[in-house]
């Protein structure tokens, strides 16, 4: 499938990117631990998590940030992100459905590029924010 190109000319402030949803499960936690090398038992060992006072194992923050990164690059195109900053606001739990949100906040020109400021987040099915962030992308023009 060919990448659909987003042009600076075609978007306006307030536009939203396509949402991406993923139901977090324990397999995600184990796979991500292996891929990242983060074997903190709070992510994969139910007994260790409960002994530390948690109700269960919880998701890696960077896994959730990765879901948001994918949503951003799917929206603005690979190679167009100039900045991406996130704040981890809540833990993610197996069984939650995580959904990305991306909104265009501002359009402008800077450093010879046509840029957009984006507000982005990942929320669960109750609308509770798990990550909030901002990103800047440079987009091509039609002209």
Where are these regions (language model features)?
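Hot-dog-fold acyl-thioester-processing enzymes
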Residues: 2-80, 142
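Mid-chain, well-packed structural core segment of small domains
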Residues: 74-98
